[in-house]
Amino acid sequence: RPFYIGPNDLNLIMNLRAAGIDHRKFMRMIEVYADITAPLYWWKEYDTYKVGTVANSCSTMHKIAAKEFTLEDFSCEHLLDEESLPPYEERVDIDHCEPLAAIDVNGQWCYYTPKTFLKMTCHVLNHFRELYLKTKEKKYWWQMIQLLPSSYNQKRTIMLSYEVLANIYKSRRHHKLDEWHTLCDWIEGLPYSEMITGKSEEESIIDKINSIGNVYVVSPGEARAAEEGKR
């Protein structure tokens, strides 16, 4: 570890942490800086944490036309594409399904996957980007701003405290969004993360092993309790 806290001080810290927010004011004074790239739909949830945080972002308003749009600019790993769907003739999801259909330039009906729609959105965004770069007319800028999907990834530099991280970890550890799980895994890797999570280092290791699946590890205390229960 890059930092070291003596066992007596660490024991005092954990007791104060367990005593509640009023007794662990020191956690508000431990600051963390990080660069995070995440989709706008995740930042919308993160922005509910207003107290004890500061963020500086790459401005979408000013930088939206700075580069060409590609799929790599979006969090789209869960979008269905051709590889994740059955062959066309076996697909039942497109039967008479107008939301998945569109007419191509030849007047033919086509059915699209969600990822294909995102690719089309990229093409449209790039079309208006080129027009905006050529003309500087704001109406083309508006097309990009209002068409931009919430899966667009934005980078921010954030500053927050161990106390804020403790609140995040408690309320978001089992959240539906994968991005929160990734952040909580990162939190567990911070120096003396037991201040944040409330778990001992041994418990954190056991949780990580159990999260792999097909295995369940118990602590020595749990093993003793189980053994006593058999008697």
Question: What is each residue range found by the language model?
Answer:
Residues 1-231:
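Family-specific signature for flavin-dependent thymidylate synthase
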